[in-house]
Amino acid sequence: MKIIWLGHGSFRIESGEAVLLVDPWLNGNPTLPEDQHDAAVIGATHILLTHTHFDHVVDVLPLARLLKVPVVGQYDLMGYWSEAEEIETVGFNKGGTVTLNGVRVSMVPASHSSTFTTPDGLRSGGSEVGYMIAAEGHVVYLSGDTGIMADMDWMGDYYKPDIGILSAGGHFTMDMQGAAYAAKRYFNFKTVIPCHYRSFPILEQSAQALIDGLPGVEVIEPQVMQAIEV
């Protein structure tokens, strides 16, 4: 399995015949160089969406049309988009699991918000969510934008993820100290990858507090477009 950070909260996850783009943000993403846009999305088979804030959703519909791939996400929004936007979608809900080209993806709760702007005004984007992604003997917990929440207790116990991709930039999500607390209290990660940081001045610029807070855990500070192989 390859995990490739596309900057901010965006990822490309490759496993076998599956190439999953998670919250792909290209245009306006200050951490993803423009000359890397094509390489970031080429060969994608699915787009996973955690919620509909602009820095996660702005490129989802254009990419779905360009790449001719389905968008996978929360049932209510996917139902709306399949009709209003005439794109292929895979809608499911928290607790549910879908298999995408051999990769099992389970939807889990997050604690955030999810709205987007339409010509008619602000619209609910359904529930904000995270994902447990199981492939090649690993379970990856992709938190999406979230704060610390009690649901992490059963999520860690039930899915037993060994890799955590945690939003940890602060202000809108957990900060590095909070992510370290959540990882220690609720999970038994072998590897942690922070995200949703280093993109805006208001967000944390270093993962040092996460590294210091998780002795014995491999904390990987991702570099944009560099594959992490697990």
UniProtKB/Swiss-Prot annotation:
Keyword Hydrolase included in the entry's annotation: yes
Keyword Metal-binding in annotation: no
Family the UniProt entry places it in: Belongs to the UPF0173 family.
SMART domains: Lactamase_B
Keywords linked to the UniProt accession: Hydrolase
Top-level taxon: Bacteria
Disulfide bonds: none
Pfam families xrefs: Lactamase_B_2 (PF12706)
Gene Ontology molecular function: hydrolase activity
Protein name: UPF0173 metal-dependent hydrolase SPO2976
NCBIfam families, per the entry: PRK00685.1
